């Protein structure tokens, strides 16, 4: 699931960190913390245009930004904003557009977790991006094309007792490509959806969950059929309760797609997976996954179904100065309806490792290495491998 004006009167106080030498941010009173930063990085990309015979390039970037959090007794408002300047050694005239974005998240709860009461979460994100490091990042294809993306989400939950709860969720997504680069166009789309969920505690640590959802889609650029579609889902599963170290939510069921006025254009199984395990204070393991319909971005008059799964690990060591991370992501996109030229199915697998060492409260050094492989059903001449390596400095407070 995926305006503000904050006025604070008073002097800014710098808080001392819990760990000596770690960045603490700027504290305004007892509730507001702002953490500004500046990233300076170099990236080597072995396959900039993600093709079978890809071209390599070197990318230099400067990214100023800030993270902020404003906390009350039972609520919090967090946000971020960033701007990225990039320079490509070989392809700057085509790829050297700047990127920028921001996001906000509001959370409120009237009671302790798993107790009778209300909880609310609101979120929004905007991004204007000139290039994507991976389709798995969820921000569209976009290679050689600028694009804009907007996400908004809301979740409301009512706990009638410590054992029974009902929730409602809503989300909106909008993706727009700026074509005209001499390459085949990509097609933007928008969608909105709702999901209702009920849960009942069947053990002290486990909830049984039942959910149903509806999504409405609109595709740009199609003249072969109606540009609107809709899908339905019914799922059941389990979720965690009354636990601090292990949190999860796993649902599976069926989904149906009506595309462009064609009823039951596709149907099949679907799933949602979200889990987090705090093994120790310094070691954390997570898993994410989902399947969903969306209009095709490659071909007008086509619909796709996406299956995605990822897992990651984070480890904090050396007095909390060094954070090591690793993740594996898999994405399968299959054509599920064609009113024109059929889109080929494709699979993407990526591995990524990274590390960030905080030298002192002012400077950190970071690096990431990633490898990505993509397979196309239409032939090996479209398959490709991609390696990216980044090293940089982060200046923070």
What does each model-found stretch correspond to?
Residues 1-29:
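Cleavable N-terminal export/targeting peptides
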């Amino acid at each position: 699931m995926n305006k503000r004006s904050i006025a604070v009167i008073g002097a800014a106080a710098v808080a001392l960190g819990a760990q000596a030498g770690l960045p603490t941010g700027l504290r305004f009173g007892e509730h507001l913390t702002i953490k500004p930063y500046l990233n300076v990085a170099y990236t080597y990309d072995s396959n900039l245009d993600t093709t079978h015979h890809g071209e390599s390039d070197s990318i230099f970037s400067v990214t100023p930004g800030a993270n902020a959090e404003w906390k009350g007794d039972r609520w919090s408002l967090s946000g971020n904003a960033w701007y990225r300047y990039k320079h490509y050694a070989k392809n700057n005239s085509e790829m050297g557009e700047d990127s920028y974005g921001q996001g906000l998240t509001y959370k409120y709860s009237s009671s302790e977790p798993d107790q009778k009461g209300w909880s609310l979460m609101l979120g929004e994100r905007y991004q204007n991006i000139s290039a994507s490091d991976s389709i798995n990042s969820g921000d569209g294809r976009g290679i050689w094309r600028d694009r804009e993306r907007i996400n908004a989400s809301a979740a409301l939950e009512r706990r009638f007792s410590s054992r029974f709860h009902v929730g409602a969720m809503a989300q909106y997504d909008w993706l727009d490509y700026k074509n005209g680069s001499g390459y085949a166009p990509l097609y933007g789309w928008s969608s909105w959806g709702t999901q209702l969920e009920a849960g009942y505690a069947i053990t002290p640590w486990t909830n049984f969950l039942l959910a149903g959802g509806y999504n409405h889609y609109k595709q740009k650029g199609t003249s072969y059929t109606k540009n609107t579609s809709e899908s339905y889902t019914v799922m059941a599963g389990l979720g965690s309760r009354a636990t601090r170290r292990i949190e999860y939510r796993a649902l599976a069921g069926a989904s149906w797609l009506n595309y462009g006025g064609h009823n039951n254009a596709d149907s099949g199984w679907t799933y949602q997976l979200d889990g987090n395990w705090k093994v120790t204070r310094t070691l954390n393991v997570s898993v994410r996954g989902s399947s969903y319909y969306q209009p095709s971005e490659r071909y007008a008059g086509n619909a796709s179904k996406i299956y995605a799964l990822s897992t990651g690990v984070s480890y904090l060591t050396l007095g909390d100065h060094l954070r090591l991370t690793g993740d594996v992501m898999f994405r399968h996109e299959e054509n599920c309806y064609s009113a024109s030229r059929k889109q080929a199915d494709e699979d993407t697998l990526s591995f990524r490792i990274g590390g960030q060492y905080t030298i002192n409260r002012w400077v950190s050094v970071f690096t990431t290495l990633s490898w990505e492989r993509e397979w196309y059903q239409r032939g090996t001449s479209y398959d490709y491998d991609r390696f990216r390596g980044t090293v940089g400095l982060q200046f923070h407070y």
